[in-house]
C-alpha cells in the first residue's frame, strides 16, 4: 500500500490510500507524498448495483448506495462515464449532499484515472423546475474532483454548505446558473473549473450565470483558475453580496450572447459582475481575463464598496471596465497594473495608477503574441490547470513589461510586475 497524490492544485492537496496500481493518479498527478488517507473506497459505476459491496469496479455500487454508506474521510470513486438521472416532466430530480465530512477528513467524490464522471439530469432544452438543482450541497467538507453536472432543471450546483471544494469540475447546459453559492455557504473553494452554456428559460436568460457567489453567501468563498463562457447572463455574478469574494487567475468571455434564439432574450452579458444592489462588497480580483462580453468585462454593478482590481486584462467587451457608480463614504476602488484594449474604460472613486489607461503605457495589439480568442477554449491540461497558450501573452518587446507597480501577493519576474494578467518570464 502507498499514498498516491490525486489532488494537486494551487497549494491544496489531498491524498488517498489506495493499492499500488492507482485508479486515481494515472498520468496526471505527481509527488507521491504522505498526507490525508481515506478510510474506505466505494467503487461506483454508471451500471452499479445497490446490492454490490463496491469493493472494486468488478462489483460496483450505485451512486445512491455509496452516498448512503459514505462517512467522513472516505472516498466515492466514480468510474468515468455518464450517470443519467431520469427526467419526469414537471418534477425535480436533485441529488442532495446533506452529510458532512470533517476538517482533515472530507468526503471525497472523484472520477477515477483522471477521467470525467458526467451527471446528466436529462432536462429537455426548454424545460425547468423551480429549485430542481443538480447537486444540492447542504453539507460541509465535501471534495469533488473530475465531476460534471449538465442539463439540471435549475442551478447545476446550489451550495449552502461550507468548506467544500470543487476541483476540475464543470457545470454546463443547465437551466440556471452553473454553480451558485448562497444562503450562508462559506469558505468554499472552486479550483480549475468550467461553467458554460447555462441558460434559464424561466426568465429568458436573465438569471443563468456561470458562477454565482451572490446575495446571502457567507465569507471566504474563492475561485481559482476558473473559466465561464457563453452563459446567458454573466460569467461570474457577485450580485448583492456584502461578503468578500476572491477571484484569481480566471477567465470570463462571450457571456450574454443569445445562443438560444430566444426572441425575448434578456441576458446581461458581463464577464465579472462584482457586486450590486448597493451592498458593500470589498471583493478582490487578480490575474484574470475578460473578453467578448456583451456588456462589461469587469463591472462594479452598483457595488457600494471598494473593489480591488489588480493585474487583469480586458479586451473587446462592450465596456472593458465599468466602475462609474457611487460608493459609500469611506469606500474606494483600488486599480493597479490592469490592461484595457479595444474598448472604453470608466473608473471613478478609485485609487488607480499603473493601468494602461492612466499612468501606465497604453496597450496596443503589438504588445501581445496573440489576440486569437479561440485559444481560450483549448482543453485544460491533464491536471486541470488552464491551458498555456499565446493568447494575451506579452510579446518580447512589449512596453507593458516591467511597467507595473509592486503589490503584495502578486509575484513577478524582472524589475517590476508587467501590466495585464500574464507575467512574461
From Swiss-Prot:
Molecular-function GO terms, alphabetical: metal ion binding; pectate lyase activity
Swiss-Prot/TrEMBL keywords: Calcium, Disulfide bond, Lyase, Metal-binding, Secreted, Signal, Virulence
Protein's pathway: Glycan metabolism; pectin degradation; 2-dehydro-3-deoxy-D-gluconate from pectin: step 2/5
Gene disruption phenotype: The pelL mutant displays a reduced virulence on potato tubers and Saintpaulia ionantha plants.
Catalysed reaction, written as an equation: Eliminative cleavage of (1->4)-alpha-D-galacturonan to give oligosaccharides with 4-deoxy-alpha-D-galact-4-enuronosyl groups at their non-reducing ends
Subcellular location: Secreted
Noted pH dependence of activity: Optimum pH is around 8.0.
Pfam family, one: Pel9A-like_beta_helix
Enzyme class (EC, first level): lyase
Positions bound to Ca(2+) 1: 209, 233-234, 237
Job of this protein: Presents an endo-cleaving activity on polygalacturonate or partially methylated pectin. Is effective in the maceration of plant tissue, and has an important role in soft-rot disease. Is 280-fold less active against polygalacturonate than the major pectate lyase PelB. When assayed on polygalacturonate, PelL releases oligogalacturonates of different sizes; upon prolonged incubation, PelL degrades the primary products to unsaturated tetramer and pentamer in addition to unsaturated dimer and trimer.
Protein name (record): Pectate lyase L
Amino acid at each position: 500500500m502507498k499514498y498516491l497524490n490525486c489532488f494537486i492544485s494551487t497549494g491544496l492537496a489531498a491524498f488517498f490510500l489506495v493499492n499500488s496500481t492507482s485508479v486515481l493518479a494515472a498520468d496526471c498527478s505527481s509527488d507521491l507524498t504522505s498526507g490525508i488517507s481515506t478510510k474506505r473506497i466505494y467503487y461506483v459505476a454508471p451500471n452499479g448495483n445497490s446490492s454490490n459491496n463496491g469493493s472494486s469496479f468488478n462489483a460496483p455500487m450505485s451512486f445512491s448506495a455509496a452516498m448512503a454508506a459514505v462517512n467522513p474521510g472516505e472516498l466515492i470513486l466514480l468510474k468515468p462515464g455518464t450517470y443519467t438521472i431520469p427526467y419526469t416532466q414537471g418534477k425535480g430530480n436533485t441529488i442532495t449532499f446533506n452529510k458532512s465530512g470533517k476538517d482533515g477528513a472530507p468526503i471525497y467524490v472523484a472520477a477515477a484515472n483522471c477521467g470525467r464522471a458526467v451527471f446528466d439530469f436529462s432536462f429537455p432544452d426548454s424545460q425547468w423546475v423551480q429549485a430542481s438543482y443538480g447537486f444540492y450541497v447542504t453539507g460541509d467538507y465535501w471534495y469533488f474532483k473530475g465531476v460534471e453536472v449538465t442539463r439540471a432543471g435549475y442551478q447545476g450546483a446550489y451550495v449552502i454548505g461550507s468548506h467544500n471544494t470543487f476541483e476540475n469540475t464543470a457545470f454546463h447546459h443547465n437551466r440556471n446558473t452553473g454553480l451558485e453559492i448562497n444562503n450562508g455557504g462559506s469558505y468554499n473553494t472552486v479550483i480549475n473549473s468550467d461553467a458554460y452554456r447555462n441558460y434559464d428559460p424561466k426568465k429568458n436568460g436573465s438569471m443563468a450565470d456561470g458562477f454565482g457567489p451572490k446575495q446571502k453567501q457567507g465569507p471566504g468563498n474563492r475561485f481559482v483558475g476558473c473559466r465561464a463562457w457563453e452563459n446567458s447572463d454573466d460569467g461570474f455574478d457577485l450580485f448583492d453580496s456584502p461578503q468578500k469574494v476572491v477571484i484569481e487567475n480566471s477567465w470570463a468571455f462571450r457571456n450574454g450572447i443569445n445562443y438560444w434564439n430566444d426572441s425575448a432574450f434578456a441576458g446581461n452579458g458581463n464577464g465579472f459582475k462584482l457586486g450590486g444592489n448597493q451592498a458593500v462588497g470589498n471583493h478582490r480580483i487578480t490575474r484574470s481575463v475578460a473578453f467578448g462580453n456583451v456588456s462589461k468585462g469587469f463591472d462594479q454593478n452598483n457595488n457600494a464598496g471598494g473593489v480591488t482590481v489588480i493585474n487583469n486584462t480586458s479586451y473587446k467587451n462592450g465596456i472593458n471596465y465599468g466602475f462609474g457608480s457611487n460608493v459609500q463614504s469611506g469606500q474606494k476602488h483600488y486599480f493597479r497594473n490592469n490592461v484595457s484594449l479595444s474598448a472604453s474604460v470608466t473608473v471613478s472613486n478609485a485609487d488607480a495608477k499603473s493601468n494602461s489607461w492612466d499612468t501606465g503605457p497604453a496597450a496596443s495589439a503589438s504588445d501581445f503574441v496573440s489576440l486569437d480568442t479561440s485559444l481560450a477554449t483549448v482543453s485544460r491540461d491533464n491536471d486541470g490547470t488552464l491551458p498555456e497558450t499565446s493568447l494575451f501573452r506579452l510579446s518580447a518587446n512589449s512596453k507593458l513589461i516591467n511597467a507595473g507597480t509592486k503589490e503584495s501577493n502578486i509575484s513577478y519576474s524582472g524589475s517590476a510586475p508587467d501590466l495585464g494578467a500574464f507575467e512574461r518570464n
